[in-house]
């Protein structure tokens, strides 16, 4: 720039600047920093260098004049001046705090001019961010041993979408959102700076310098002037130019030339800007300053329903390079899902079973492989995880598939990891480094969020997942997919695309089986055939009529009818007497749910099949090629029983028998020889070789898997299964049969829900093999109820409902990590979705009310102004006392004596207008009163209600403020008792009923009485203090005191008080509404907050946390216990209770926490005295914890409440002998449970042993650690821990 000037012009500029500086008459440079102190020189080159140094070359060092302003020079004194005294204050230095904020410039325009500054919280400045001090996704990676499972010593990653207190979230570090969320809870001053530190009531209060004290703030002025030095220089040059113009009018000064050149440059720049603006799009707004108004947040819809009523013709153009392709054309809903995944969105796919939801999951897995990221596939149960592992291994050749369960880790570094939701929850709380690489989380069978025990885990996982993770939710059809997706979207601040299809790939045809006849009732177009339904009733009623005529439309012996005589199992059709039931199945049904028994007056049983029923229907379906079939039976015992009834029926030829035999032999080679001959395996083998099988929770895991694999290969033609078979297992069949549409759910018999029926019926119909799926509902001896049948088969599926509840493990984990508060977890749960969705609407209402508050005008009055605020306060207190009085009066029997028919009362209508009327009737139950009103609403001349209290005895006050009520024709009005303001002693003697009937004499008396009242005579209250109970007496006393205080005020004598109080009262009402809205938006309105506070009190009392909610040693141990009963187990561990037992005794005692127990059978005696002593100690500790729970009124789950009554110690002997080395066959001889239950209990015990072992490390108990390791070794053997056939 300087090279554009000649040497002579530079010399002239130099001389001109010297003259400006040295001229005493022109005081342009007032501050010492910017004063131009030039040395005298005549050399042009030297002058050029000085100007360059001064203006063009920025210095790396600050001038001393500026440094003196921002630094303190320590006071130094000579030894002679010390006088032997030391200044100890010099030693009391407060160390500099860690500064987690930084100042950022606000820039505007394309040039990036600085327009202001802002202060932001920034964790990137924290040195050495790691898993123990940072929630950032960019923190340093921890040890490899914790990369998969994480550790309780680690913090989780920042949950996505949730504004964190004083924490900069990962999304903000990536620049995808503003700091408003992260710092909205910190207070800022007028300049936008944080002035009150978190946790303190007050902070820095800088002194604002008034205008008259500008000289005292010169240093701050100099800093400000330093930032504006360029502008000041321009101003001074302009001033100098004006002076030179006066002296040399004919010649131009150097300064003027400079200014002209600068103006020319500016004009050229503006011309360039205009050319650039022509090239830029009109709507461009980056880098431009825009006026920002503090608008009310608009309610944003995060869920977007995708329209499927179209075909995507250009799918190949939209997805030119798909991550995966299929040999068949995708359905529209699958294409939409794939498209949105490629766009980086999250999707919620709701479709029927076998509709092809798995395609979406497969595409996400392939996409993650292509992007070199990971996918996590979560399933509701471990068995489904194993099956999905096998399916995906067969589906993908190029993608690594891994499995993580409680006891197995296969290929944990794979691109796709399959696990249960509980495992993922644990990984999130423990900050597993593996989460960094996850791009997709697939939630399969989302409708299991309705599960009462495990639904809360799904919500926790969704809330805790980091921002970068995308969601793929797969579910059966549910009515509120949009609501659920909108909750996830709002919580995670992500758009969720809802793709819901009611279409079935294979339509269903629902039939009823009645007396060897298959009757279609609902066709494949979902049309109900009522004539056919009546036909099934006629068939069954016709058979029943041999014994007794039918009297009900629903048929005899149904769920709500008396049992009819006659059945299918006896020769004479009358049923047998003297058997276990009198009637029962043989007698045509039951009374209600059962029949009259021979020994007891009422014995309930179900209308069920005979031994011929299943052979008949199997042969019928076999002839019509409707096999294979699955029969859903809601009892393990009946599954086995019904399979036994098919003895003699064989579905397999010799070749199939040979293949089944070879597969079984190959599968059980992993078992010990003695385990291969277990009764259950031998029986299952004999059934399988005939093409028949059973599937329920009592089977050994290896037997269940063996049956599932053979069924998928088509070897099993008839399968009797419980409803767990329908839980996600991809095993379609030709026909599904319901042995009943009622089941026992643990509490009692009930009908199946439409969702349960749809889930099980959806197994019917194999895509590509069957044109329709056949569903059969069994009707044995009694016809089905049409209403029940329609509701179950065609009803609306169960809505997704939150099962969110607080657990101690969750509370302690959140208190441990401190970043996410428990209140926030509750706030963002699905249970609070409705309230949170209304928050933008509440904020909008608050803004409207605040604006309305600003428009209220207050009139000045010499009488009122001094104490009208006090009057309003006392008036509101008096009104509140009156409401409390009436609430208590309703509970008191005296109300009936006071509020008798004809009693004159003054009451308020919904608009707060006063009216007079006679009591006609009172309902104490509903706390309402019917009043015969005879006055118009009392209003002020301007139409506003008169809010003042109606004091009937104060004549002067009453005449000023309630001069005259206007009479009207009487009418009846129902008002709450609390709306009554005054109950007078006056009573209308004649019956009001006659007045209503327009009796002339009664009407005349009524008119005379009302005219007398309206003449303004003094009225007295009917409630006497002396005759009331203690509580009412106290309220009346308080109210009288308030009244006396009111009449001491000066404003009570104001003639216009009723008008002057209106704006004050209106402002009070608006403020109250605003407070209510703020309360609705606050954490104090959370429905689970009282429960949280009670549980906090429990944790404090039991010393899991301290008074400041810091997690203590007990709490850290409880964080490790995820299997339930964490408080009791922690007490056992820290009490060193387990340390005094041997490993085999420890696992036996711990079995009480995994075995659910039974209530009917008695517990077997404990085998050793030591175990008996351990049992007694566990009961003592549990009773102690129950006392604490009861003290704080903690709501308990059914399992927690019945822990001591369900005989949970019944498995103790079995586990003890297993740990001692007995074979599985031997322990089954003493087991009260089936083989599958025993295996499940021992498997869960291994998980508890692992958790206790980790807890022992925390407390430093090496002996317990060794014992728990030994205990795991003792139980992990043989058939219980045999490898899965899917792995």
Curated annotation (Swiss-Prot):
More info: Present with 5770 molecules/cell in log phase SD medium.
Compositionally skewed regions (Gly residues) per UniProt: 555-567, 585-595
Organism superkingdom: Eukaryota
Family the entry assigns: Belongs to the helicase family. SKI2 subfamily.
Parts of the chain that traverse the membrane: none
GO molecular function: ATP binding; ATP hydrolysis activity; DNA binding; mRNA binding; RNA helicase activity
Name of the gene encoding the protein in the UniProt record: SKI2
GO CC term, one of those recorded: cytoplasm
Species the sequence originates in: Saccharomyces cerevisiae (strain ATCC 204508 / S288c)
EC supergroup of this enzyme: hydrolase
Quaternary data: Component of the SKI complex composed of at least SKI2, SKI3 and SKI8. The SKI complex interacts with SKI7, which makes the link between the SKI complex and the exosome in order to perform mRNA degradation.
Sites bearing Phosphoserine, chain numbering: 209
Motif mapping: DEVH box: 444-447
Catalytic activity reported: ATP + H2O = ADP + phosphate + H(+)
Protein name listed in UniProt: Antiviral helicase SKI2
GO process terms (BP): defense response to virus; mRNA catabolic process; nuclear-transcribed mRNA catabolic process; nuclear-transcribed mRNA catabolic process, 3'-5' exonucleolytic nonsense-mediated decay; nuclear-transcribed mRNA catabolic process, non-stop decay; regulation of translation
Cellular localisation: Cytoplasm
Organism phylogeny: Eukaryota, Fungi, Dikarya, Ascomycota, Saccharomycotina
């Amino acid at each position: 720039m300087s090279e554009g000037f000649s040497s002579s012009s530079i010399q002239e500029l130099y001389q001109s600047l010297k003259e400006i500086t040295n001229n005493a008459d022109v005081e342009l440079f007032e501050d010492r920093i910017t004063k131009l102190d030039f040395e005298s020189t005549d050399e042009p080159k030297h002058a050029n260098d000085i100007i360059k140094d001064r203006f063009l070359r920025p210095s790396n060092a600050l001038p001393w004049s500026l440094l003196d302003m921002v630094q303190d020079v320590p006071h130094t004194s000579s030894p002679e001046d010390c006088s032997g005294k030391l200044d100890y204050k010099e030693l009391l230095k407060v160390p500099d705090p860690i500064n987690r904020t930084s100042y950022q410039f606000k820039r505007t325009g394309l040039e990036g001019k600085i327009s202001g500054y802002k202060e932001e919280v920034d964790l990137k400045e924290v040195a050495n961010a790691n898993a123990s001090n940072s929630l950032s996704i960019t923190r340093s990676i921890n040890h490899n041993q914790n990369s998969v499972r994480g550790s309780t010593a680690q913090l989780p990653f920042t949950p996505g979408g949730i504004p964190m207190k004083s924490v900069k979230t990962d999304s903000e570090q990536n620049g995808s959102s503003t700091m408003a969320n992260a710092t909205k809870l910190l207070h800022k001053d007028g300049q936008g700076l944080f002035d009150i530190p978190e946790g303190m009531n007050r902070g820095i209060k800088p002194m604002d310098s008034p205008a008259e004290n500008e000289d005292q703030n010169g240093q701050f002025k100099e800093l400000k002037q330093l930032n504006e030095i360029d502008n000041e220089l321009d101003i001074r040059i302009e001033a100098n130019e004006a002076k030179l113009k006066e002296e040399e009018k004919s010649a131009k000064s150097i300064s003027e030339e400079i200014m002209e050149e600068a103006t020319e440059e500016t004009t050229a720049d503006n011309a360039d800007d205009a050319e650039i603006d022509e090239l830029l799009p009109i709507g461009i707004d980056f880098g431009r300053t825009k006026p920002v108004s503090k608008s009310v947040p608009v309610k944003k819809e995060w869920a977007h329903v995708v329209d499927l009523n179209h075909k995507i013709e250009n799918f190949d153009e939209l997805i030119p390079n798909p991550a995966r392709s299929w040999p068949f054309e995708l359905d529209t809903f699958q294409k939409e899902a794939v498209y949105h995944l490629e766009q980086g969105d999250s999707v919620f796919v709701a479709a029927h079973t076998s509709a092809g939801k798995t395609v979406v999951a497969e595409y996400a897995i392939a996409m993650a492989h292509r992007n070199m990221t990971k996918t996590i596939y979560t399933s509701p149960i471990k068995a489904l995880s194993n099956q999905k592992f096998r399916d995906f291994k067969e589906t993908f050749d190029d993608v690594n598939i891994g499995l993580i369960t409680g006891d197995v880790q296969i290929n944990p570094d794979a691109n796709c990891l399959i696990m249960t939701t509980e495992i993922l929850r644990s990984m999130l709380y423990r900050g597993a480094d593996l989460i960094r690489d996850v791009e997709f989380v697939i939630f399969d069978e989302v409708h299991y969020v309705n599960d009462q025990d495990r639904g809360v885990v799904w919500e926790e996982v969704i809330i805790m997942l980091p921002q970068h993770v995308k969601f793929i939710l797969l579910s059966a059809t549910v009515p509120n997919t949009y609501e659920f997706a909108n909750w996830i979207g709002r919580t995670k601040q992500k758009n969720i695309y809802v793709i819901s299809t009611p279409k079935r790939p294979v339509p269903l045809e629902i039939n009823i089986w009645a007396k060897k006849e298959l009757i279609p009732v609902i066709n494949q177009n979902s049309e109900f055939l009522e004539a056919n339904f009546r036909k099934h009733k006629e068939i069954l009623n016709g058979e029943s009529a041999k014994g007794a005529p039918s009297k009900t439309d629903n048929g005899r012996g149904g769920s709500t009818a008396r049992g009819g005589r006659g059945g299918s199992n006896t020769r004479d059709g009358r049923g047998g007497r003297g058997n276990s039931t009198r009637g029962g199945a043989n007698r045509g049904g039951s009374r209600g749910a059962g029949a009259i028994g021979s020994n007891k007056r009422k014995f309930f049983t179900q209308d069920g099949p005979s031994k011929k029923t299943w052979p008949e229907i199997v042969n019928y379906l076999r002839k019509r090629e409707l096999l294979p079939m699955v029969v859903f039976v809601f009892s393990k015992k009946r599954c086995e029983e019904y399979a036994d009834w098919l003895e003699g029926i064989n579905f397999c030829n010799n070749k199939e028998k040979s293949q089944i035999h070879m597969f079984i032999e190959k599968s059980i080679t992993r078992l010990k020889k003695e385990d291969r001959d277990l009764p259950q395996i031998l029986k299952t083998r004999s059934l399988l070789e005939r093409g028949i099988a059973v599937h329920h929770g009592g089977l050994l895991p290896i037997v269940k898997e063996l049956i599932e694999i053979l069924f998928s290969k088509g070897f099993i033609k008839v399968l009797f299964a419980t409803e767990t078979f329908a839980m996600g297992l991809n095993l379609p069949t030709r026909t599904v049969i319901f042995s009943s549409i009622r089941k026992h759910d643990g509490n009692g018999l009930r009908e199946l829900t439409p969702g349960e029926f749809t889930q099980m019926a959806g197994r019917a119909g194999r895509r590509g093999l069957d044109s329709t799926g056949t569903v059969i509902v069994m009707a044995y001896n009694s016809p089905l109820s049409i209403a029940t049948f329609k509701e179950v088969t065609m009803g609306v599926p169960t809505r997704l409902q939150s099962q969110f509840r607080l657990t101690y493990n969750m509370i302690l984990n959140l208190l441990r990590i401190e970043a996410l508060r428990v209140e926030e977890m509750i706030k963002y749960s699905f249970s609070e979705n409705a309230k949170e969705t209304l928050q933008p609407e509440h904020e909008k209402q608050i803004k409207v009310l605040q604006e309305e508050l600003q428009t209220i005008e207050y009139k000045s009055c010499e009488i009122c102004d001094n104490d009208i605020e006090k009057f309003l306060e006392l008036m509101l207190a008096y009104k509140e006392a009156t409401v409390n009085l009436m609430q208590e009066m309703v509970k008191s029997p005296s109300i009936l004596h006071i509020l008798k028919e004809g009693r004159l009362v003054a009451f308020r209508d919904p608009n707060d207008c006063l009216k007079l009327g006679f009591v006609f009737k009172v309902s104490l139950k509903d706390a309402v009163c019917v009043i015969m009103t005879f006055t118009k609403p009392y209003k002020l001349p301007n139409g506003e209600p008169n809010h003042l209290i109606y004091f009937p005895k104060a004549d002067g006050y009453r005449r000023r403020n309630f001069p005259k009520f206007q009479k009207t024709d009487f009418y009846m009005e129902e008002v709450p008792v609390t709306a009554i303001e005054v109950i007078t002693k006056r009573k209308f003697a004649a019956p009001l009923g006659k007045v209503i009937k327009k009796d002339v004499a009664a009407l005349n008396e009524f008119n005379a009485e009302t005219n007398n009242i309206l003449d303004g005579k003094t009225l007295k209250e009917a409630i006497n203090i002396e005759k009331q109970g203690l509580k009412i007496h106290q309220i009346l006393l308080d109210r009288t005191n308030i009244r006396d205080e009111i009449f001491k005020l000066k404003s009570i004598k104001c003639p216009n008080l009723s008008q002057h109080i209106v704006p004050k009262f209106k402002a009070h009402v608006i403020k109250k509404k605003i407070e209510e809205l703020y309360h609705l938006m606050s954490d104090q309105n959370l429905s689970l907050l009282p429960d949280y506070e009670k549980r906090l009190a429990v944790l404090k009392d039991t010393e899991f946390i301290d008074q400041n909610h810091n997690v203590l040693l007990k709490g850290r141990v409880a964080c490790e216990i995820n299997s339930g009963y964490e408080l009791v187990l922690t007490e056992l561990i820290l009490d060193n209770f387990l340390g005094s037992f041997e490993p085999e005794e420890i696992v036996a005692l711990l079995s009480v926490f995994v075995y659910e127990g039974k209530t009917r059978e008695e517990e077997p005696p404990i085998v050793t005295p030591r175990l008996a002593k351990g049992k007694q100690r566990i009961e003592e500790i549990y009773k102690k914890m129950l006392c604490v729970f009861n003290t704080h009124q903690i709501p308990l789950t059914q399992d927690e409440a019945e822990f001591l009554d369900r005989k949970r110690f019944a498995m103790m002997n079995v586990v003890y002998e297993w740990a001692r080395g007995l074979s599985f066959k031997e322990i089954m001889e003493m087991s009260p449970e089936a083989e599958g239950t025993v295996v499940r209990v021992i498997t869960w015990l291994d998980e508890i042993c692992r958790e206790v072992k980790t807890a022992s490390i925390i407390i430093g108990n090496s002996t317990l650690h060794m014992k728990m390791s030994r205990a795991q070794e003792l139980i992990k053997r043989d058939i219980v821990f045999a490898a899965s056939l899917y792995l």
